[in-house]
């Protein structure tokens, strides 16, 4: 199915609504101000000025109103992105994406989210405020996460510190843990959305394809069909950007919980300030407590030990 998005002015919006008035259909979705249905084309207009055409006649109808908007369709479209070459118009396709956060933070969990965004919801998700999470504040991500969870089929996994440390002590690398979580989150989401299937799956790349699947060689169920890997994947499809936000929101919620237990606001990251805070907690509440809220194998542990 073809999907085309145009940016149109307020005047053109009025013309579009008049032209398709006889084909009007009611569509109750955030950001939608008009929708119409032709035998071979669905037309959706958004408050943002975006006009989306879907179906066999999308190109024909879009040509009436403007120039087709160019969208990123491969890793070369995003400066610095590395990984698989994506299909043309990938950004407009129905994609299941996954991303993780918390991997570089001494305190708190590692979280992974997988999110399915069908082509019909891409503009809705954009209307809800999704961008590359690195461009958004934590407070903003907390704010929009509930709407995103309600709008999309998804799975969010949290690997808390006790389990993380247990796996690490058994010889699991962080890369292996991430691969297992991505695979599980993708599998969960595919199960929830069945019998519908995505056109493609995009994983924000943290390991080469061969390394990733080697991590999963002992897993019973491995998601492999139509899977692409790319760095900066959150800029290549809104599904990964949404996954990044949901993973971050889950991480922040868990950090709130741990901060309440610790009696102070835990710092993010793994800086020297984190070392100082860790040493303070160690002196006051002991090694076992500190271990229960941290990724114990990080270098911060030994740095904090020297400060006690």
Curated annotation (Swiss-Prot):
Residues 93-308 form the RNase H type-2 domain. GO terms for biological process: DNA replication, removal of RNA primer; mismatch repair. GO terms for cellular component: cytoplasm; ribonuclease H2 complex. A divalent metal cation binds at residues 99-100, 204. PROSITE patterns: RNASE_H_2. GO terms for molecular function: magnesium ion binding; RNA binding; RNA-DNA hybrid ribonuclease activity. Keywords: Cytoplasm, Endonuclease, Hydrolase, Magnesium, Metal-binding, Nuclease. Its cofactor is Mn(2+); Mg(2+). CDD domains: RNase_HII_bacteria_HIII_like, RNAse_HIII_N. It is an enzyme of class 3 (hydrolase). It catalyses: Endonucleolytic cleavage to 5'-phosphomonoester. Its EC number is 3.1.26.4. InterPro entries: RNase_HII/HIII, RNase_HII/HIII_dom, RNase_HIII, RNase_HIII_N, RNaseH-like_sf, RNaseH_sf, TBP_dom_sf. Manganese or magnesium. Binds 1 divalent metal ion per monomer in the absence of substrate. May bind a second metal ion after substrate binding. It comes from the Bacteria. SUPFAM superfamilies: Ribonuclease H-like. The keyword Magnesium applies. It is found in: Cytoplasm. Endonuclease that specifically degrades the RNA of RNA-DNA hybrids. Belongs to the RNase HII family. RnhC subfamily. This is Ribonuclease HIII. It comes from Lysinibacillus sphaericus (strain C3-41). The gene is rnhC.
């Amino acid at each position: 199915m073809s999907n085309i998005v145009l940016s149109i002015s307020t005047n053109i919006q009025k013309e579009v609504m008049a032209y398709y008035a006889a084909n009007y259909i009611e569509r109750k979705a955030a950001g939608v101000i008009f929708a119409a249905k032709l035998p071979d084309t669905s037309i959706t207009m958004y408050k943002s000025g975006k006009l989306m055409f879907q179906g066999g006649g999308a190109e024909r109808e879009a040509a009436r109103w403007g120039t087709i908007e160019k969208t990123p369709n491969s890793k070369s479209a995003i400066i610095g992105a590395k990984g698989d070459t994506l299909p043309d118009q990938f950004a407009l396709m129905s994609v299941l994406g996954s991303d993780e956060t918390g991997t570089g933070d001494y305190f708190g969990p590692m979280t992974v989210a997988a999110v399915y965004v069908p082509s019909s919801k891409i503009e809705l998700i954009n209307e809800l405020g999704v961008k590359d999470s690195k461009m958004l504040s934590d407070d903003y991500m907390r704010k929009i996460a509930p709407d995103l969870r309600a709008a999309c089929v998804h799975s969010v996994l949290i690997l808390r510190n006790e389990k993380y440390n247990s796996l690490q002590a058994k010889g699991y690398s962080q890369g292996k843990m991430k691969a297992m979580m991505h695979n599980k989150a993708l599998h969960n989401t595919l199960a929830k959305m069945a019998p519908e299937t995505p056109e493609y799956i995009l994983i924000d790349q943290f390991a080469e394809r061969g390394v990733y699947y080697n991590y999963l060689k002992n897993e019973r169920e491995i998601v492999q069909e139509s899977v692409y890997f790319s760095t900066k994947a959150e800029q290549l499809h809104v599904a990964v950007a949404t996954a990044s936000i949901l993973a971050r929101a889950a991480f922040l919620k868990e950090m709130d919980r741990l901060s309440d237990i610790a009696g102070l606001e835990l710092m993010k990251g793994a800086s020297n300030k984190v070392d100082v805070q860790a040493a303070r907690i160690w002196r006051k509440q002991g090694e076992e407590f500190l271990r229960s809220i941290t990724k114990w194998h990080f270098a911060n542990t030994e740095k904090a030990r020297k400060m006690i």
